[in-house]
Regions:
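Non-catalytic, polymerase-adjacent accessory regions of viral genome-replication enzymes
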Residues: 1-149
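Core nucleotidyl-transferase/polymerase catalytic module
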Residues: 115, 130-346
Length: 346
């Protein structure tokens, strides 16, 4: 049901996307988001210290466009050859345990459009030479699917993720490495630390003590990241956007006892099985949090200098978002416009 509520991915995200390019202009130009903003930003009497998003509420989307562009370009250009290819610690959908995960038999044409097989599919030069002589592997038109699996989350219920095809996981880890390293070496590290949640915990504790900061909790956050949202977030980093699109699986195999296996098309950008899900959603939520806080402070123009002044009051770790308490209303509005759901009960 969550996936059904998301917008259908644009042609840019199709499996046969070769030759297609992104044509998005920004959140403020998307009919879906503009109409959602009008619907959700009802005129209300503001609470003390709040700036209600009323007459100029759509300017909030314009501000978001400027913030996401600053964040995306601050990462610098993405080139796959500059970053490490690897397999993640989890299972993959197409390799039984013990089978060679470096023998890529399902490298699709779509994946090849951003990750050329001859340059990206081999962990060593000897592997490339061996494949050159045997011609055992190469690209295929058909893209492999992911597979829905349950992993432990709580004692009550498991978390559902999708194990990715080995070829896709190999390339997703490359993109993840780029995003982690570029975050750690840029100003974004003042708001995001992918390897340590301590800053979020400290600010959440401070907020619980003096009420100055609030932690916002989302429901099924990764399942609500739409391709439309990702495309608008990374539009100013086209090579990165191409890599995210090419390494994304479009279909998922669902196996359930007593029922016939079925393969479904997914609308969401990815599941938690995709190595890029966490850094991608973190950047989306960071951009929204920064925008909402700037808005609440009365800013209507965006600059990197203004953004950096928010360090110490905004931090994001995945879907764990901490913002000034008086920015929660604008944050909630933006999140809901972008198809996310805030847990108001927590």
């Amino acid at each position: 049901k969550t996936d059904d509520a998301l917008p259908v991915p644009a042609p840019f995200w199709r499996q046969d996307r070769i030759g297609c390019s992104s044509s998005v202009r920004g959140f403020a130009f998307e009919h879906r988001y503009v109409t959602a903003m009008f619907r959700l930003s009802k005129p209300e009497v503001p609470k003390e210290g709040e700036n209600p998003p009323r007459a100029d509420h759509c300017h909030l989307l314009t501000m978001l466009d400027k913030v996401v562009d600053i964040v995306a370009t601050s990462l610098g250009p993405y080139r796959s050859e500059d970053w490490e290819f690897s397999h993640g610690p989890g299972a993959v959908s197409d390799k039984p345990k013990g089978e060679n995960k470096y023998a890529f038999a399902n490298w699709s044409d779509c994946l090849d459009s951003a990750f050329p097989f001859s340059e990206c599919a081999f962990s060593s030069y000897s592997g490339w030479v061996n494949n050159f002589h045997t011609r055992r592997f190469g690209t295929k038109a058909e893209m492999p699917h992911s597979k829905l699996v349950a992993v432990p989350k709580t004692f009550v219920k498991p978390r559902l993720i999708a194990s990715e095809p080995s070829e896709h996981m190999w390339c997703q880890q490359n993109v993840k490495h780029y995003m982690y390293e570029r975050t750690a070496s840029s100003w974004i590290r003042e708001f995001v630390n992918f390897t340590d949640q301590e800053r979020n915990q400290q600010l959440a504790l401070l907020g619980s003590m003096d009420g100055s900061l609030a932690t916002v909790d989302l429901s099924s956050a990764s399942d609500r990241v739409s391709c439309m949202c990702v495309e608008n977030t990374f539009k100013r980093n086209p090579l990165l956007l191409d890599a995210l699109c090419a390494s994304r699986t479009r279909r998922c195999l669902i196996s359930q006892d007593g029922f016939e296996d079925r393969i479904i098309e997914i609308k969401k950008y990815s599941t938690m099985g995709n190595a890029t899900t966490f850094p991608v959603e973190t950047r989306i939520f960071l951009s929204v949090a920064l925008t909402a806080t700037l808005w609440q402070q009365g800013h209507r123009e965006v600059s990197l200098a203004k953004i950096r002044q928010l360090a110490g009051s905004v931090t994001v770790f995945g879907d764990d978002i901490v913002v000034p308490t008086n920015a929660v209303r604008a944050l909630t509005l933006l999140l809901e416009v972008l198809d996310f759901k805030v847990n108001s009960s927590k």
